[in-house]
């Protein structure tokens, strides 16, 4: 029996352009053009990710190869974070990883 290994990296959960599960999406019904753009991007990226994972299932092992969360956002002065609390970033990354429904998960 073949076993599928999938490697993902650079989720950057917590960054405006990072992978964002639905629980943390921006509301697209806003007057702010930047937020509307980000709301659309979040949905498109999540749709791409979930379709790719669904196409790859069943996944035996998932390797998460770094940068699951954005962290403090020091380079941008935290201006590009959609969630600055790292515990929320961790929850976001956990949802992304759990979506794969892999039998084994290794985070490097």
What are these regions (language model features)?
Residues 59, 91-108:
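Eukaryote-skewed repeat-based solenoidal scaffolds used as protein-protein interaction platforms
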């Amino acid at each position: 029996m073949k076993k599928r290994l999938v490697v993902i990296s650079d989720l950057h959960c917590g960054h405006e352009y990072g992978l964002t599960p639905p629980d943390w999406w921006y509301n697209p019904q806003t007057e702010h053009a930047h937020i509307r753009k980000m709301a659309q991007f979040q949905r498109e990226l999540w749709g791409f990710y979930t379709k790719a994972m669904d196409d790859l299932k069943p996944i035996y092992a998932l390797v998460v190869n770094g940068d699951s969360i954005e962290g403090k956002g020091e380079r941008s002065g935290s201006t590009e974070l959609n969630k600055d609390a790292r515990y929320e970033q961790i929850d976001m990354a956990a949802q992304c990883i759990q979506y794969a429904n892999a039998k084994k998960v290794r985070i490097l």
